[in-house]
Amino acid sequence: MIYIDNRQNKIKVNEELENKIKEIIDYALKEEKVNIDYEISVVFIDNNSIKEINKDYRNIDKATDVLSFPMLDYEEGKVFKDIYLNYEFDESDLDEGNLVLGDIALSLEKAEEQSKEFGHSFLRETCYLTIHSVLHLLGYDHMEEDEKVIMRQREEEILKSFNLHR
């Protein structure tokens, strides 16, 4: 189950965008071997809102593009398919039978700014940020160079499957 909640009014959100986001999340999770019913919440917000969240949770007082709030724990260097592939989840990890993977807060205002800056479509940027955040929910990180290379490779492979190129 993918929940999308539009809490901003600066960028028009239509059914096509929502459906593409849901489709790309579902595809990414299948590619990452999430073979259990799941729940992810995506909240579309503006730069002011994401700045507040970034300050509250990361102590960084500036707007960012996307924030991820994973619900599962991961050992350093491990991702979902390394730890949870055939795992028996506890009832506390489930909500109405769905594994709660976490929440995504995405600034559509920042996505639009970055799409212009990088010279590609708003759809491509929004899908990229969504994939990036989903991978964080699955334990991927980019703090170390080797982790960054792996994460970028996964992002590009998924985008390529949707014909979304830079």
From Swiss-Prot:
Recorded family membership: Belongs to the endoribonuclease YbeY family.
GO cellular component, one term: cytoplasm
Keywords recorded for this protein, A-Z: Cytoplasm, Endonuclease, Hydrolase, Metal-binding, Nuclease, Ribosome biogenesis, rRNA processing, Zinc
Keyword tRNA-binding attributed: no
NCBIfam families, per database record: rRNA maturation RNase YbeY
PANTHER family assigned: ENDORIBONUCLEASE YBEY, CHLOROPLASTIC
Location of the protein in the cell: Cytoplasm
Top-level class of the enzyme under EC nomenclature: hydrolase
Name of the featured protein: Endoribonuclease YbeY
Cofactor details (free text): Binds 1 zinc ion.
Entry cofactors: Zn(2+)
One MF annotation (Gene Ontology) recorded for this entry: metalloendopeptidase activity
Residues where Zn(2+) binds: 132, 136, 142
InterPro entries registered for this protein in UniProt: MetalPrtase_cat_dom_sf_prd, YbeY, YbeY_CS
Any GO BP annotation: rRNA processing
